[in-house]
């Protein structure tokens, strides 16, 4: 899921990519966070989602809780880049733990484009409220280190 990253010589001429093997592809060796995969951690005390949204600003993102789910939506209008014009949009939906303290949830966007949605868990399993609630996205100045696998 690497959209809008442009094409490279090895994308157009894969037979010129490697002397190691004709089947070797540089594009397959991209880092974890460049893959578009999110990281969800749920331990005893905390629930956290890390998502690479480097092509979006906080104004392009909407994060809201709807019943027992968090919905993350990103969309930006058509922009010019090095390779032409591009627009991007995504939707992600994650089920929240029943014991998540929804009143203490935070959401921030790091300088390197990692969106972190996080909240503490309560000791008792209280019934979550079934309503829609927006979660503001704050901007951080420091980059987020890559999540551990």
Curated annotation (Swiss-Prot):
Question: GO biological process annotations for this chain's record?
Answer: lens development in camera-type eye; negative regulation of apoptotic process; protein refolding; response to heat
Chain residues that bind Zn(2+) 2: 76, 78, 83
Q: Please list the residue ranges annotated as the sHSP domain.
A: 28-138
Q: Which GO CC annotations does the UniProt entry carry?
A: cytoplasm; nucleus
Mark out the compositionally biased spans (Basic and acidic residues).
130-143
Which Pfam families does this one have? Crystallin, HSP20
Keyword annotations for this protein, in alphabetical order, are:
Cytoplasm, Eye lens protein, Glycoprotein, Metal-binding, Nucleus, Zinc
> Which parts of the sequence are annotated with region: Disordered?
125-149
Please list the residues annotated as glycosylated.
Answer: 138
How would you summarize the oligomeric state and partners of this protein?
Heteropolymer composed of three CRYAA and one CRYAB subunits. Inter-subunit bridging via zinc ions enhances stability, which is crucial as there is no protein turn over in the lens. Can also form homodimers and homotetramers (dimers of dimers) which serve as the building blocks of homooligomers. Within homooligomers, the zinc-binding motif is created from residues of 3 different molecules. His-76 and Glu-78 from one molecule are ligands of the zinc ion, and His-83 and His-130 residues from additional molecules complete the site with tetrahedral coordination geometry.
Instruction: State what this protein does.
Output: Contributes to the transparency and refractive index of the lens. May act as a chaperone, preventing aggregation of various proteins under a wide range of stress conditions.
The name on file for this protein is Alpha-crystallin A chain
Where does this protein come from, organism-wise?
Rana temporaria
Identify the coding gene.
CRYAA
């Amino acid at each position: 899921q690497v959209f809008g990253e442009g094409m490279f010589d090895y994308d157009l001429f894969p037979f010129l990519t490697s002397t190691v093997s004709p089947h070797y592809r540089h594009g397959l060796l991209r880092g974890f966070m460049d893959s578009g995969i999110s990281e969800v951690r749920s331990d005893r005390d905390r629930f956290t989602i890390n998502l690479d949204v480097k092509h979006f600003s906080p104004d392009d993102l909407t994060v809201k809780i709807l019943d027992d789910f968090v919905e993350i939506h990103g969309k930006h209008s058509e922009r010019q880049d090095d390779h032409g014009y591009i627009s991007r949009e995504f939707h992600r939906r994650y089920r929240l733990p029943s014991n998540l303290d929804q009143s203490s949830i935070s959401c921030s966007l790091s300088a390197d484009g990692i969106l972190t949605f996080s909240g503490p868990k309560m000791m008792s399993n209280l019934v979550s409220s079934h309503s829609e609630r927006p979660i503001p996205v704050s901007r951080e100045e420091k980059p987020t280190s890559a999540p551990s696998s």
